[in-house]
Amino acid sequence: MTNTKHEFSSESEFLAAYDASQFDRPSVTSDVLIFSVSNSVAENWRKADKQLFSVLLVHRDDYPQKGKWNLPGGFIGIDETALDAAYRILRNETGATGNIYLEQLYTFDAPNRDPRTRVFSIAHMALINKNKLHYSGKHDAKWFSIEYNNGKLLLHNEDLTLTEADLAFDHAMIIKTGIERLRNKIEYTDIVFDMMPSEFTLGELQQVYEIILGRKMIPAAFRRTIANKVVPTDKMRSGSGHRPSVLFKKHC
């Protein structure tokens, strides 16, 4: 006995007869990796404040994986693009408006990455100046400074230190993928300035490069890297224990 293939006379006839239930329908989420930088007050008054490279995490109050921390995210609506969903999540979680740097990072699709069902995550990376944020406090979200060396990730804030095991799903992998992407782009693009205040010293900027790259930079090499990216202002910053420094801004 042979199966006879039905011949349709039009696209609309085919679509009307199409049975989507014949195939599995995995869910798709958008998870947004939000990076920023901030100051940590120096313990030694002779030293400049330390720059921190940070990520925003949300505490999970419900199952699955209750008690862990995850990146801001959610399911993509049926009428949304992945990018639209990422912007929606970014606005809802941070209150950020205006021109925010956001790029698609990677699609995470391990079959067992979510215990509920088959879920793909289209992850995006956002770079934000914290001064532009107007966080509403409706979720238990906190900034954690990033320590990433030799493939090992630790996250710190004033109350907690998180290991990879404290992060929900595969979000440790998403964070590490984002760090590697940023490391690969920081020296030949100007995306670092999306996390910086409008004015900064060269010392502050060098610290940001170093904490993202995970290595020290020779001052002369650093200045070559940023030579065409910044311009001096006519302002100075004074601080206890060190000489006033010229403030720079991004070269437009």
What are the roles of these predicted feature ranges?
Residues 215-234:
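Charge-enriched amphipathic alpha-helical scaffolds
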Residues 20-22, 112, 235-240:
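Short proline/glycine-enriched turn/loop segments at secondary-structure junctions
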Residues 230-252:
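Long, intrinsically disordered, low-complexity Ser/Thr/Pro-rich regulatory/activation regions
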